[in-house]
Amino acid sequence: MKTRLIKIVAASLTALLTVSCSSKKEIMKKSYWPNEAHLVISVSMQFETGGQPEGAESPFSGTPLPKGQPDLPAESWYRYGANEGIYRMLDLWKKYDIKVTSHVVGTAAAKYPEVAKAIAAGGHEIAGHGFAWDDQWNKNYADELKFVKDGVETVEKITGERAVGYNCNWLRRSPNTLKVLQELGFLYHIDDLSRDEPFITKVNGKNFVIMPYTLRNNDIVQVAGNHWSPDQFLSQLKHEFDQLYAEGAGKRRMMSISFHDRIGGTPAMVKAMEEFIIYAKQKQGVIFMRKDDIAKMVQNDPNTPIDNAEEKYNN
């Protein structure tokens, strides 16, 4: 009887220790973000107005004008981003003490330096978006390096901020892009859709951070492209948030949202985004972060996944 009692006590202690260790592991799993946050939200604010080429996509693209003929209504649609959109979004971020990442086209900053300076003055990240609104996928190594470098230096001269993050036009990288970015001292890029968390890839044997972008929570895709209303876009954000927040109890999750100056900066879209911010901030463990701050945090974190799916291009 005594022996049996000892065995029962021993088994109970073993079970208790197992539960305790399991609980500790669960706590560790929740410690992926500052203050054990469940979910990080990262907002992109693309500043492209003034950098677009002739015939760039607009609400008037369905009835294009002859080549060489200026499309004045389309040009005015783009100017809205510099005149109204960026400033309206900056007011929103300031109201809720949110810092975002702004991918800035070099020629946009050169044409509207006061807008680029206002973004930097608000404490927002200035990230690279090319010298002009142009393709990179078809450039050779030397031309691509010059294109990226010229864009970074143009914006840096205006804002005083040197980009460490990058976004290609329509995400379309060349096989050399990451090697170009690494040579120029970049920390991360966003032209990837493969995960809902940051990850590492090796470029010439060194860690390079991937901060996945979004098409689902992207105004140019859903509002301009699919003709969603601001209410539909808000509903999408809430559903995405709810799911990622629930998953964030057990693993690292990041929610990406993308706004473009002339689309996300309209009154109804800013109002919808404000409703989302209020909705998200009601939950505990939700933080908004700049992409460069996230990238610095995860770059050498052993919990960050390593994915070398594009290894053949990066070495």
Predicted segments, located by residue:
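Bacterial N-terminal signal peptides that target proteins for export
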Residues: 1-9
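C-terminal motif of bacterial Sec signal peptides marking the signal peptidase cleavage site
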Residues: 17-20
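Catalytic alpha-helical scaffold of carbohydrate-active enzymes acting on polysaccharides/glycoconjugates
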Residues: 26-165, 170-209, 234-253, 257, ...
